[in-house]
Design a protein with these regions (language model features):
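Conserved SAM-binding loop of SAM-dependent methyltransferases across substrates and taxa
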Residues: 48-59
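A short acidic, Gly/Pro-enriched loop at the edge of an enzyme's catalytic core
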Residues: 66-73
Length: 217
């Protein structure tokens, strides 16, 4: 069983789903207004998230596998940090940008690793979530890579009530800084890049806030 299965179970809870989708709806309407962007063809990379569910509930089609060019690509929940090397990270960012049609917008979320280097600590994010009246605590356990200070291996422990725990291997991850993402997007031909002020992303199974960066191609 993968961590995706746990996330899918969270979205089956009506209260979790409704609260997160309403929050995402407000966020996205403000973001797209600020960027003067109207999403039509959307691709979601990585985990199912409140943004993709929100857009689907608005009657829009959201693909999880690329089949064409898109005007909107979502790379939330730190999708670009799931890489085992700098070259791998560059490649997944480049691959995402190639899926954008001219004028398309990429939205990505990342934590502020410069001011909060959580990847250097064994205990990462920890959070509580109630799914269908069952209590869960999600704890990130990190194993820093001492040969590469920007890399670490992550395992998520999910504690259920007071009698069970499941370990999910998330594999190797790599920090991504705003200037890095800006450079990689510029290398891919982006025309505009920015980090949204006072706009933060947080999924129900996370406690830490993530900054939202955008690129227009």
């Amino acid at each position: 069983m993968s961590f995706d299965s746990f996330i899918d179970s969270a979205w089956q809870d009506t209260a979790v789903n409704s609260t997160a989708v309403k929050r995402a709806q407000k966020q996205l309407s403000q973001i797209f207004l600020e960027l003067n962007h109207t999403p039509v063809d959307i691709l979601n990379l990585g985990y199912t998230n409140a943004a993709s569910l929100c857009l689907q509930s608005s009657g829009l089609s959201v693909d999880c596998e690329p089949v064409k060019k898109y005007d909107t690509v979502l790379a939330l929940d730190e999708y670009f940090t799931y890489a085992d090397s700098e070259q791998h990270q560059k490649q997944i960012i480049a691959d995402a940008t190639k899926l954008l049609a001219p004028g398309g917008v990429l939205l990505a979320s990342i934590r502020d690793y410069r001011n909060n280097p959580v990847h250097k600590r064994n205990l990462g994010d920890s959070s509580y979530i109630n799914i269908n009246n069952t209590h869960y605590v999600v704890v990130e356990i990190n194993r820093p890579d001492h040969s590469d200070r920007q890399s670490w291996h992550q395992t998520n422990f999910v504690i259920e009530n007071d009698n069970a725990a499941t370990a999910y291997e998330l594999g190797y991850r790599r920090t991504l800084y705003f200037k890095q993402l800006a450079k990689y997007c510029n290398d891919a031909g982006c025309k505009q890049f920015g980090v949204l002020k006072e706009r933060f992303w947080k999924s129900p199974w996370r406690r830490s806030m993530e900054h939202i960066a955008w690129s227009r191609f």
